[in-house]
A protein has these predicted regions:
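Short, intrinsically disordered, charge-balanced linker/junction segments flanking boundaries
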Residues: 253-256, 260-265, 269-278
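Solvent-exposed, extracytoplasmic
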Residues: 107-124, 153-155, 159, 193, ...
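Short hydrophobic/aromatic beta-strand element in the GNAT-like acyltransferase core
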Residues: 127, 184, 275
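Extracytoplasmic/periplasmic ligand-binding sensor regions of membrane-associated signaling proteins
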Residues: 120-124, 133-213, 263, 267-270
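Juxtamembrane interface helices immediately C-terminal to a transmembrane segment
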Residues: 38, 52, 56-75, 79-86, ...
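Extreme N-terminal signal-anchor transmembrane helix of membrane signaling/transducer proteins, especially
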Residues: 1-14, 18, 23-62
Length: 278
């Protein structure tokens, strides 16, 4: 009888143990499920936040790039206009001097005074020169160039003598070794006879009004300006050593040479990512 009771008690204890085990299992399952749900909720929240942050970053980046491109394009257009006005004013100064010299072309003092006045009056030119129809220098400023009486055979001089009209030369190396552009105006007497020309030079690697105009700008974000001619040659660059260099493989330069204007992001010839306006 006693063994029977013990047996029953043992069975009851085993049954209770199984019930407790089942309950604990259910509790563990519930806990694991809650952890899983919590983990998923946190994961979704984090992913949603990161996605929103990335989307916001991309939108702001695109807006910033778009605004930067517009600013660069507007600034480039403004500089082009200012440069055109400078060159027009320089040509007008030379035209006025040509009228004066046409009357007194044989007066050496007048030639010397006019070249000096033209160079010093506005600082438009780094040097000025009067050349006769044979290419011989009659007067120049500054006198330190020591060109008087010399026959000029530079590309700019040959162009001016051949064209016999107002012109702006292509860049070339001058007789004294400077990389220059010459703005010239022909001199004709009252009978229409060609006497020669008066020219003003812009030294591309030295200071002057044009150089200062291009060098000084108000963007302090690492932006810079460069100017090219139709032969892809750099006429202005903040790295003076690159002035005169021909640049190939730059899509912005190619677009400019096709007469286009606009904006774009590109990798330049130095493998630097740029936002360019042109």
């Amino acid at each position: 009888m006693l063994s029977f009771i013990v047996s029953i008690i043992a069975k009851e204890i085993q049954g209770q143990h199984r019930e407790v085990s089942i309950l604990l299992g259910r509790v563990n399952i519930n806990l694991d499920l809650k952890k899983l749900i919590l983990f998923l909720a946190i994961s979704v929240t984090v992913i949603t936040f990161l996605n929103g942050f990335y989307s916001s970053y991309q939108v702001q980046k695109q807006q910033l790039q778009s605004q930067t491109l517009k600013n660069h394009n507007a600034y480039a257009a403004k500089l082009v206009s200012a440069t055109d006005r400078f060159l027009l004013a320089a040509q007008q100064q030379l035209a006025y001097s040509a009228k004066i010299l046409a009357i007194q072309f044989n007066d050496a003092n007048t030639l010397a005074q006019e070249t000096q006045r033209l160079r010093l009056q506005t600082d438009s030119f780094n040097s000025t020169v009067v050349v006769d129809k044979n290419g011989v220098v009659l007067a120049h400023s500054p006198l330190s160039l020591k060109l008087k009486g010399q026959l000029l055979e530079s590309d700019g001089a040959k162009q001016a003598l051949a064209n016999k009209k107002p012109m702006i030369s292509e860049p070339y190396i001058s007789a004294v070794g400077n990389l220059v552009i010459v703005i010239s105006h022909p001199i004709f007497n009252s009978q229409g006879e060609y006497l020669g020309y008066i020219g003003g030079t812009l030294y591309l690697k030295q200071k002057g009004i044009l150089h200062d105009l291009l060098q000084v700008h108000f963007h302090k974000d690492g932006s810079y300006i460069y100017v090219i001619d139709k032969n892809r040659r750099l006429l202005y660059h903040p790295d003076v050593a690159r002035i005169g260099e021909q640049v190939f493989g730059n899509p912005v330069i190619e677009a400019v040479l096709r007469g286009e204007s606009g904006t774009r992001q590109l990798i330049n010839s130095q493998n630097i990512v740029m936002l360019a306006g042109y």
